[in-house]
């Protein structure tokens, strides 16, 4: 049993006003359903808020995704949930973070340290690698990162290839977020 507003956030669907980061993260790991509303008068003394009973069932097997990256992507997307993803990923703070992570990724890839760490960090790795290889993207090299607008165009190209640049976070379903993360990872853009 939860406070009604919190319970409604857990069970919200895309395009509803209460759809938020909490909803997306909860649905990644479980199925959530609203069972019943509990009125104020069922308690003594009556509280000032309504309550609801919610069923949360864990998914078996759980989705294979790097939770640190997942949280980073969802956090960025819901920083302003009604802005388009294109506008969110054009912000300087967002681009600074992604460019720093991209440089680190390229350096790890060049040193060969990435192969051993990615399979252990992903919790199995092979499923993630299959998803990433299904979205081939021409990657930028370290020399290409000298021009800031080039990296910005690269990020926006990843969004446009998946038709995400004009979409809003509050309208994306769970599968859309998983596809977006897979597209960014295939392009070498990470959210750690």
Where are these regions (language model features)?
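Class I S-adenosyl-L-methionine
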Residues: 1-192
């Amino acid at each position: 049993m939860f406070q009604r507003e919190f319970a409604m956030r857990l069970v919200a669907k895309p395009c509803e006003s209460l759809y938020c980061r909490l909803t997306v993260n909860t649905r990644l790991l479980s199925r959530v359903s609203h069972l019943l509303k509990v009125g104020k008068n069922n308690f003594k003394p009556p509280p000032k808020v309504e309550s609801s009973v919610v069923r949360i069932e864990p998914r078996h097997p759980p989705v294979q995704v790097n939770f640190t990256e997942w949280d980073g992507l969802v956090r960025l997307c819901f920083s302003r949930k009604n802005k388009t993803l294109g506008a969110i990923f054009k912000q300087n703070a967002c681009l600074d973070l992604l460019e720093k992570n991209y440089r680190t990724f390229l350096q790890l890839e060049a040193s060969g340290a990435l192969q051993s760490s990615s399979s252990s960090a992903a919790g199995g790795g092979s499923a993630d690698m299959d998803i990433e290889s299904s979205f081939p993207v021409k990657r930028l090299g370290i020399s290409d990162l000298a021009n800031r607008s080039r990296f910005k165009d690269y990020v926006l190209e990843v969004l446009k290839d998946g038709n995400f640049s004009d979409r809003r976070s509050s309208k994306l379903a769970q599968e859309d977020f998983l596809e977006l993360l897979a597209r960014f990872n295939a392009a070498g853009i990470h959210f750690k």
